Amino acid sequence: MSSKRHILTAVAWPYANGPRHIGHVSGFGVPSDVFARFQRMSGNNVLMVSGTDEHGTPIQVLADQEGVSARELADRYNRIIAEDLVALGLSYDLFTRTTTANHYAVVQELFTGLYRNGYIFSKTTKGAISPSTGRTLPDRYVEGTCPICGYDGARGDQCDNCGKQLDPTDLINPRSKINGETPEFVDTEHFMLDLPAFAEQLSEWLKSKGGEWRPNVLKFSLNLLDELQPRAITRDLDWGVPIPLEGWRDQPNKRLYVWFDAVIGYLSASIEWAKRTGDPEAWRKWWQNSDAESFYFMGKDNIVFHSEIWPAMLLGYSGKGSKGGEPGSLGALNLPTEVVSSEFLTMEGRKFSSSRRVVIYVRDFLERYDADALRYYIIAAGPETQDTDFTWAEFVRRNNDELVATWGNLVNRSISMAAKNIGHIPEAGELTDADRAVLDASKAAFATVGERLNRAQFKAALQEAMRVVAEANKYFSEQAPWKLKKTDPKRMETVLHVALQLVSDAKTLLTPFLPASSNKVYEMLGGTGTWTGMPRLEEATDSIGGEEGVSTYPVITGDYADNEARWESIPIVPGTPLKPPTPLFRKLDQSVVDEELARLEAAAGA
């Protein structure tokens, strides 16, 4: 096995019915970027892909309400979301969208392969329609009481309270989410994915993940196997990917269900990336090599799609379900190595809700605060393994106490004293036991933090990295180089050399978490070139969804290989010129808490 691993970082696709809020990016965004950046620094071949999920009824309904087409609405939020994720520093190799001709072609190929192998069949079911409009009500637009747990607010596809999968006809007292009326149920023909045909294969695969996956994800996924039922993969609507079969392709009101096409986006985005890089077959290194690895990042409400449905689709397309079959034209495809799910982030004790305006959008947040401050909070205090509440008081405290007073303070006092008194990185004289101990601990942290990051234990990894910062601050205070200036200037230079090496190490350890500020520290230490790559927007041109003509849309990409960052202690170079540093982070006034709470209450009450 090559020492360089091929690692697919597959990031859940944000839905393009509005801007994304900080709860969204705490689940799919920041954790996946921390992981991808670390793996790149470790020398691995990373492919990080995602895009906007643009089909389905919610977009169609919102577009109708605004008097625009579904396409226009998707175009608007595709751009807004892409701009916000770039501002947050998420290092996608490709962030695209589900309305490209490439995506349509790959989705239809997956459907065709599954159908040919016998894992898709048609069935007449009961579909909900609005009595007043005659329009179809997809399952997510039918609500009612869950027949399992009694929760009043279960959707027609799933109860968020107990996690059980449902159909609209299962609900007690069903009602339309749009206007509250009781829906009518009529016969309609749909295609179904035969999930029970994968029960044995899914069980064997999931049980092999014991000790590797987060316990909550594995337990939830195994429980899903107890209730495997065929699941509809088509819907009665005109906004989505056409069904690629004779007699169905041209039906105006039958489309593939949005969840079916969205999970295929990981594959279609990888194929699109390969085409854009000039090597159309390159995607296969991440999807078909036996030693390739794939990590899927999402919030816990999407576990079912990634640990049950998508693996079933991959097995069926590859001809590996209970009915056998042959791989489709793309070839056999790898199952996920790990499904990495975060829990939910709440806000000041309340569930995020765009409709009730209990929300802060990424764009609004970044207009007032630094991206790295948000990234730090999400990892340090976020919902990695349990639901967590975002509070402005805690955000301000962590920003001021941990970023400004701890890490920022170490950077400032170490570099400023060396720049002022020496003007460059000094030579190290003879090292004392204290010098060697703190340097050895700093070097050892790369293995400790790296092991945590490899296992997607981001909070623990950040704590270990910040422990290096704390020990460096302690060393600086105890050695008191400002006192040595007159009594022992050579010793002062040695202490400053050690302190600057610790700053350099800490910068490297914190790079996956805090890429923008790590670039600043690299420059403050006299570094040249790019330390760690940052994402950028590019305009892409493609025919959209098989329609006539072409469309221009933004994609996120970046140059992440051509930089200096690598996961090891890199010796600083004596003689490198130093300039007085600028503040690394902004200290926030306590008044921010009251201002933001007032802003939240005003919005929620509007």
Swiss-Prot record:
EC number: 6.1.1.10
Cited InterPro entries: Anticodon_Met (IPR041872), Met-tRNA_ligase_1 (IPR023458), Met-tRNA_synth (IPR014758), Methionyl/Leucyl_tRNA_Synth (IPR015413), MetRS_core (IPR033911), MetRS_Zn (IPR029038), Rossmann-like_a/b/a_fold (IPR014729), tRNAsynth_Ia_anticodon-bd (IPR009080)
Cofactor note (record): Binds 1 zinc ion per subunit.
Binding site residues for ATP: 354
GO cellular component: cytosol
Short sequence motif named 'HIGH' region, residue ranges: 14-24
Molecular function per GO: ATP binding; metal ion binding; methionine-tRNA ligase activity
Encoding gene per record: metG
Residue numbers binding Zn(2+): 146, 149, 159, 162
Family designation: Belongs to the class-I aminoacyl-tRNA synthetase family. MetG type 1 subfamily.
Family matches, as SUPFAM superfamilies: Anticodon-binding domain of a subclass of class I aminoacyl-tRNA synthetases (SSF47323), Methionyl-tRNA synthetase (MetRS), Zn-domain (SSF57770), Nucleotidylyl transferase (SSF52374)
Name this polypeptide is given: Methionine--tRNA ligase
GO BP terms in the entry: methionyl-tRNA aminoacylation
Cofactor: Zn(2+)
